[in-house]
């Protein structure tokens, strides 16, 4: 585990910051997480997930060891080129209930951006208990993440009409 010299930002504060990315965002409790969805006009039951803040392990998601005292995960997707330049090609989709093979990344390390242990195949990343400077360093990526979600949302809406 990484040594920590700066305190982690509180999970609630991270969720509130994400809501400030733009219009059409809402926060919902989803699978025990604080999830941020893109759902302009509230036309879908939830919308498309933009990011999540999770503070406990799930039945099929234990690799990050989120059940440790004070540990939570901020997770969001990256545009394909950003994911590839940082982590290489995304791993294969795991079998149902499995984790992806993320190579040598320590998925339990605090404050380090790593591939998501379950959703890296969809270009999702995680950072555990980020400090304020670490959150600030991620801010340029978050609007890009939202644009990926908006494009996916628009494609889904076109296919539905």
Language model features with spans:
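Charge-dense, helix-prone N-terminal extensions
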Residues: 1-161
